[in-house]
């Protein structure tokens, strides 16, 4: 487990603020049946902290307690036991909720509104004035690649396009804490890569991101620290380097070597390690990188598509400044 720093304002080794944004202690959630008998222990005695500017991953298989934890962080569910603080307050506090952006696992959208009307509706819930709503909607729709679909209603969108508009609504209030539950579900590899890049950009701006996912690649690509759930319990927590390092294994990468040179190197290694395993192979490109390369070539050839476009840079109002708003 990673120890929490004694000074809440200190800087971590990676340069990120150690100010604690989310504090969870002894968090437990037991769902009961009609008669009040325990039916399922979804979350069981969980402890963790999330720091300002950190991308914190909740990783685990389906049904491991990730989404239940997220709902308690949002104040949508009461814990059976334990304590949660978000920005030093209860997650049910109105001022706390105003500083949070949330993308649920299934986006709840009004199917007869178009994308601009959808963002205007959610912006109005945060009491943004009309000019701010219009400006932010324009920037967000460009950012998520939906600025060419303004006249289409959300009900006509594919699932991937609905995820994009869902992400835009989660950012309409310029939140200090962004909670994303399976943000890449239904997205094509291009959209997945853009979402990951956006998450990194938000963290660089000083925002805190909690990412709940069962997809290993999502978590591995963007998270500073990860907690792994199974059976409602934390099985492991730490930085990716701490969790993934294999101190008893060494990898050496070289250009292609002549066969004679390779044989000499292998002979030296085998003489040194005895019966230990030695493996020689050629590195391969991962499928995501190859797919993106193919699509990029098609885009450069000016091939047309009627779906979502590639997203643009991070919305201007999300990039300006690094200071979070006061509570």
Explain the meaning of each model-derived region.
Residues 82-96:
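Conserved ABC transporter NBD signature motif
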Residues 174:
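Conserved catalytic motifs of ABC-family nucleotide-binding domains
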Residues 178-182:
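Catalytic Walker B motif of ABC-type/P-loop ATPase nucleotide-binding domains
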Residues 194-284:
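ABC transporter nucleotide-binding domain
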């Amino acid at each position: 487990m990673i120890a929490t720093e004694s000074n809440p304002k200190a800087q971590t080794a990676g340069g990120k603020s150690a100010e604690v944004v989310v504090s969870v202690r002894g968090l437990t959630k037991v769902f009961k049946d009609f008669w009040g008998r325990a039916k399922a222990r979804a979350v069981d005695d969980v402890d963790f902290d999330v720091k300002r500017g950190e991308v914190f991953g909740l990783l685990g298989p389906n049904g491991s307690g990730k989404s239940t934890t997220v709902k308690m962080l949002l104040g949508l569910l009461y814990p059976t036991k334990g304590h949660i603080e978000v920005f030093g307050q209860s997650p049910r506090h109105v001022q706390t909720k105003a500083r949070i952006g949330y993308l649920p696992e299934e986006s709840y959208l009004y199917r007869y509104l178009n994308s601009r009307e959808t963002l205007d509706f959610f912006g109005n819930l945060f009491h943004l004035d009309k000019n701010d709503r219009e400006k932010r909607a324009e920037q967000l729709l460009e950012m998520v690649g939906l600025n060419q679909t303004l006249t289409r209603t959300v009900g006509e969108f594919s699932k991937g396009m609905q995820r994009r508009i869902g992400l835009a609504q989660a950012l309409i209030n310029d939140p200090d804490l962004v909670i994303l539950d399976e943000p890449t579900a239904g997205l094509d590899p291009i959209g997945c890569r853009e979402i990951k890049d956006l998450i990194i950009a938000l963290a660089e701006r000083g925002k805190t991101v909690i990412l709940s996912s069962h997809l290993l690649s999502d978590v591995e690509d963007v998270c500073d620290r990860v907690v792994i759930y199974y059976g409602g319990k934390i099985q492991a927590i730490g930085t990716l380097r701490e969790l993934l390092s294999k101190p008893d294994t060494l990898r050496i990468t070289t250009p292609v070597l002549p066969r004679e040179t390779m044989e000499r190197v292998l002979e030296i290694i085998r003489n040194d390690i005895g019966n230990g395993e030695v493996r020689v192979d050629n590195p391969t490109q991962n499928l995501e990188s190859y797919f993106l390369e193919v699509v990029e070539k098609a885009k450069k050839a000016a091939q047309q598509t009627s779906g979502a476009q590639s997203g643009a840079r991070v919305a201007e109002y999300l990039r300006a400044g690094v200071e979070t708003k006061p509570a």
